[in-house]
Amino acid sequence: MYPAHLLVLLAVCVSLLGAASVPPQPLNLVQFGYLIQCANHGSRATWHYMDYGCYCGAGGSGTPVDDLDRCCKIHDDCYGDAEKKGCSPKMLAYDYYCGENGPYCKNIKKECQRFVCACDVQAAKCFAGAPYNDANWNIDTTKHCQ
């Protein structure tokens, strides 16, 4: 085997090892995004909520900076309660529909799906009812969220 072939083989192996450590994309975050769009009637893009305040986005700590951030903390706590029930809230898909008054869970028989859908619908409606303060997007969480 030529040295160049060994280098290519090594590069492929390293790439595969790196790909194996990439976590799967949570399934229900796409659904949650649709629920948010349904609740706010498309008035604000979903990505605006991904890095807002201390709790909107990955993780969370400290005191929520405003009502919208409080919605995110409540949603995080709801997901925590779902995990205590043995559910995997970020991975569950569920049935819902978008009505004139916002999103609703369909008649869901499985407890985990019903619970997580309720968490997401409550949060989406909370987001729609809370004012959005541009100054709280992409804040320095090490300074404001202790």
Swiss-Prot record:
Compartments where found: Secreted
Tissue expression remark: Expressed by the venom gland.
GO annotation terms (biological process): arachidonate secretion; lipid catabolic process; phospholipid metabolic process
Residue positions assigned to the propeptide: 20-27
Gene3D superfamilies in UniProt: Phospholipase A2 domain
Gene Ontology CC annotations of this record: extracellular region
Record field: catalytic activity: a 1,2-diacyl-sn-glycero-3-phosphocholine + H2O = a 1-acyl-sn-glycero-3-phosphocholine + a fatty acid + H(+)
Uppermost EC category: hydrolase
Enzyme Commission number: 3.1.1.4
GO molecular function: calcium ion binding; calcium-dependent phospholipase A2 activity; phospholipid binding; toxin activity
Active site: 75, 120
Function field: Snake venom phospholipase A2 (PLA2) that inhibits collagen-induced platelet aggregation. PLA2 catalyzes the calcium-dependent hydrolysis of the 2-acyl groups in 3-sn-phosphoglycerides.
PANTHER family: PHOSPHOLIPASE A2, PHOSPHOLIPASE A2 FAMILY MEMBER
Family designation: Belongs to the phospholipase A2 family. Group I subfamily. D49 sub-subfamily.
Record protein name field: Phospholipase A2 PS22
